[in-house]
Amino acid sequence: MAKCEVCSKATSFGNSRSHALNATSRTWKPNVRKIKIIDNGTPRSIKICTRCLRSNKVTRAI
């Protein structure tokens, strides 16, 4: 499942609406990437959304 391990952003659910206001179910998925970070001095791999990645909420391992 696409879920950010930093902010817990996950798939959200709702409806698509046509011009006639017919409702069909749809999902919105977060833009999640798998990166390596430094956690307590050791590198580990996490799934993080691009919003958290851009705002430097984690230290990226190079």
Curated annotation (Swiss-Prot):
Residues passing through the membrane, by range: none
SUPFAM superfamilies reported for this sequence: L28p-like
GO cellular component, one term: ribonucleoprotein complex
InterPro entries noted in UniProt: Bacterial_rp_bL28, Ribosomal_bL28, Ribosomal_bL28/bL31-like_sf, Ribosomal_bL28_bact-type, Ribosomal_bL28_sf
GO-annotated molecular function: structural constituent of ribosome
Keywords attached to this entry: Ribonucleoprotein, Ribosomal protein
Gene3D superfamilies attached to this UniProt entry: Ribosomal protein L28/L24
Organism: Ruminiclostridium cellulolyticum (strain ATCC 35319 / DSM 5812 / JCM 6584 / H10)
Annotated protein name in UniProt: Large ribosomal subunit protein bL28
Family affiliation: Belongs to the bacterial ribosomal protein bL28 family.
Domain of life: Bacteria
A single GO BP: translation
